[in-house]
Amino acid sequence: MFLAQEIIRKKRDGHALSDEEIRFFINGIRDNTISEGQIAALAMTIFFHDMTMPERVSLTMAMRDSGTVLDWKSLNLNGPIVDKHSTGGVGDVTSLMLGPMVAACGGYVPMISGRGLGHTGGTLDKLEAIPGFDIFPDDNRFREIIQDVGVAIIGQTSSLAPADKRFYATRDITATVDSIPLITGSILAKKLAEGLDALVMDVKVGSGAFMPTYELSEALAEAIVGVANGAGVRTTALLTDMNQVLASSAGNAVEVREAVQFLTGEYRNPRLFDVTMALCVEMLISGQLAKDDAEARTKLQAVLDNGKAAEVFGRMVAAQKGPSDFVENYDKYLPTAMLSKAVYADTEGFISAMDTRALGMAVVSMGGGRRQASDTIDYSVGFTDMARLGDSIDGQRPLAVIHAKDEASWQEAAKAVKAAIILDDKAPVSTPSVYRRITE
């Protein structure tokens, strides 16, 4: 039997905690036998003293084990259970293509996703732009969809990593969110509860990233790869660029539209294609569905070209209570904004920088995201035809097309777009879509 205050004291004095001590504390968070003050105290000691790799693995696994851990063995699936997690960005719609693409190649993708957070869009919010789409099927239905379709994208239920929910809420109000061991534990507890064979992490870098610097993004990616592999799940990470909006659109319905167009081949933004393919390649190799990069790319290109990936997406939408002909008739179903018109720069030049975070917040301000949990979302608003870094801007080329609910909202968004996009008289050096691959 342990005492919570003795565990806090031990960590406060700079000592490593044992697996048993960490499990006792995390189970106490779940059972409400540990107070909020004690959670806050431990979080702050971890913030200042960090954690060893064994401590990080123990923390993650204890939080994973605080609730249900999905087990797929009884389904006798003929492929690996694989998933991707992104630290979030603007126009980051990769999940909607990646899940169906990997499923079409023989993987099973039980993706448990989140809502928008701050300036970043949420996969669940995007999917809810589809009429009838059910993000909370019951456990049996979730398993059926994975077995039949190969991919389902759902919301986190209260049975998955419940200790994390309480731990995170306390961190949020005690300035201890940005601790790498605590971020790692929080992300991986939920992902590892999916019962995965392999995971790929997409850690964003740049002006729209969760971590403020390249070095911190890299440190987080390395921590996640180390802890997840330590917990027995084959994991790699990619550092990908978020110095500009990833897709050509940012919002909810507008990003779903772009995802369908990507899958059908109607339109594929080159950077979005690069990042999506790179993540899918990792999933195929880690899931042992391809032996190397070349084989993985060949398989992925084939399921895009033959329509199989688009078909899987359509079947997922139908299985989750969306329209059965969504892929064929997406424009019939997706909401459209009252006012859609282009915004132009006041000067001419090359786009040299973009405040991606500010562009994400502009979508939130239009009603496309939440400032607080109780807010309702306007799924129709957002940006399309986003200009890219290096584009030559003049009176002919707009910075973006803004989809807004009224003129006042459009004007406010136009002001934000102009302020967020910096023009220069010479083109910037182009940045890669993927900076680095991190393995154990």
UniProtKB/Swiss-Prot annotation:
Entry keyword annotation includes Glycosyltransferase: yes
Enzyme Commission identifier(s): 2.4.2.4
UniProt GO BP: pyrimidine nucleobase metabolic process; thymidine metabolic process
One Gene Ontology cellular component annotation held by this UniProt entry: cytosol
Molecular-function GO term, any one: 1,4-alpha-oligoglucan phosphorylase activity
Keywords: Glycosyltransferase, Transferase
InterPro entries named among the record's database cross-references: Glycosyl_Trfase_fam3, Glycosyl_Trfase_fam3_N_dom, Glycosyl_Trfase_fam3_N_dom_sf, Nuc_phospho_transferase, PYNP-like_C_sf, PYNP_C, Pyrmidine_PPas_bac/euk, Pyrmidine_PPase_CS
Main EC class the enzyme belongs to: transferase
Pathway: Pyrimidine metabolism; dTMP biosynthesis via salvage pathway; dTMP from thymine: step 1/2
Family of this protein: Belongs to the thymidine/pyrimidine-nucleoside phosphorylase family.
SUBUNIT field: Homodimer.
Family matches, as HAMAP family: Thymid_phosp
Function: The enzymes which catalyze the reversible phosphorolysis of pyrimidine nucleosides are involved in the degradation of these compounds and in their utilization as carbon and energy sources, or in the rescue of pyrimidine bases for nucleotide synthesis.
Name used for this protein in its record: Thymidine phosphorylase
Taxonomic source organism: Salmonella choleraesuis (strain SC-B67)
Chain's gene name: deoA
